[in-house]
Amino acid sequence: MVATRFSPDPGARRRVVVTGLDLVTPIGAEADAFWKAALAGVSGVKRISHFDPEGLPTQIAAALDDRALIEEFRAEAALDSRDPRGVVVGVRAARGAVAAAGARPVLASRRAGVFVGTSGERHDLRDLGAIAYASREAGGRVTRAGFVGEFARRAAARAAYRTWPQYLAARLADHFGIEGPTATIQTACTSSAQAIGEAYRAIRRGTVDVALAGGAECIVAPIEVQLFCLLGVMSRQNATPETASRPFDARRDGFVIGEGAGFLVLEAADHARRRGIPAIAEVAGYGTTCDAYRVTDEAPDGRGAIGAMRRALADAQLGPQDIDYVNAHGTSTPMNDRVETAAIKTVFGPEASRLLVSSTKSMIGHTISAAGAIELATTVLAVRDQIAPPTINYRVPDPECDLHYVPNTSVAARIRAAISNSFGFGGHNDCLLVREIER
C-alpha cells in the first residue's frame, strides 16, 4: 500500500484524546456551571412553561425555556432568527468546546470533520393549528389544498431546510470552515454517542486529525411529549417535578424528557501534542450493537447492551478490573434500569459490586439525541476530577437494581477508566470508554 497523508500506516493505533468540551443543559448553560450543579445534585426538571401542557399525561420536563438566554446565544453566533432552538444551543456548545480546545485554526481544513447526533426539529401543534386557521375558506372549512398551500408559504418563509436533521452539521461546518467529512446520525437515544464513536474511528483510522462531535436536541413540544406518553415511557409525577426522574429507585415510573446540547473536540494525541494543547482524557474504546428485537423495547436479556460494553472494553484492550465508573443510560423506566443493571453485572462479573454507577438523567432528564454527548462529557469530567456525580432521587432500593448508584451525593474516588452507556429505541446500543491521561 502506498502511504499518503490521507492514508497513514494501517497498522498504527492512533490514540484519540479530548481537548475541549462544552454543554448547554437545564442546570448549567456551559460546562463549568453544569458540572458544579451536577456534583451538587441539582434537578432541572419542572412544570413545562413555554407552552400550556394542560391535558397532557406528562406536564413536566427539563426544558431550555429561558428565551432571553437562547436569543443571547443566537446573537453571539450571528445565527438567523429562523434557526430552531436546537441549532442555536448546538452551535453554542460547539463554539464553547472549540474555544476550550483552542481548535479554531485547525478546524478549517480537510483534515477535520464534524459528526452530529440529532433528530432535527418538527412542526408542533401550534404551528399546524396556526396553518389550519390561516387556510380557512368561506364558512370556516379547511381543505387539503388550502392547508398545503399555506404550509408551503410558511415553510418557504421559514426556510424549511433549517429543521432538517443534517442542518446542524452543515451549519457547524460552515461556521468553522470544516472541509473534511461531515455526518448526521439518527439512532434515537444513541445518536450523539454514535456520532462521537464514528468521530473517534475516523481519527483512529487516519481519515481526520481532529473532529468536532456531539449532539443537540430541543423537542419539548406538545406532539413530542404526547408521542412519548403514548409509548408508555414517561413519568407522570406531575405534582413533584424535581423528584420525578429517579433511576434505579423502586418507585420509578418513566423518564422525563429533557433538552440540551453537548460537543467535544476529539483529536489524535500526537496532533494535540504538536499544538501544545493538554488533553483532558483519552477516548480509548467504542462498542456499538443492535438488539434486533423490537423497535419500541430493548431485548429483555440485555444482549445488545452486553455486546456494546464488551466491544468497548476489547477495543480499549482493557478488562472489567480496569473500569471504576459507569455513567449509565439510566432512564428511570422500570425495564431499562433493570436490564442495564443485569447487563453490567454480566459484563463485569465480580467486579460489578465495586463499580460506581450513576445516571445524569436523574438531574437533566432524557435529552434523547443529545444524551450520549452530554453523558460522555460528564464521564470525561468525572475522570478529570476523580469524582463520580450522583444519581439523585434515589430513596427506595429495588432488589433487581443492586449496584452502587452513587445515591444523592457525589463520591470522590480513584477513576482510572470509565464507560458511558447509551441505549435507544430501535435496539441501538453504544458504549464509549474513556481513561485518564498518562502523565
Per-segment meaning from a language model:
Residues M1-D80, A101, T118, D270-E282, ...:
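ACP-dependent fatty acid/polyketide chain-elongation machinery
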Residues M1-V18, V106-S109, A316-D322, S353, ...:
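Flexible, low-complexity linker/loop segments at domain and module junctions
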Residues R15-T19, K46-R47, A239-A316, Y325, ...:
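Condensing-enzyme catalytic core mediating Claisen C-C bond formation in acyl metabolism
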Residues V18, V42-Q186, A216-V225, P320-N336:
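Conserved beta-ketoacyl condensing-enzyme motif
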Residues V18-G20, A38, A94, V114, ...:
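Conserved small-residue
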Residues G90-A103, P165-F176, T182-E217, V256-I277, ...:
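Active-site-proximal alpha-helical scaffold in enzymes
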Residues E137-A155, G197, R201, C218-R273, ...:
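Glycine-/small-residue-rich "gating" segment that lines the acyl/pantetheine channel
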Residues T207-D253, Y286-P300, G330-D337, R354-H404:
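Acyl-CoA/ACP chain-elongation machinery
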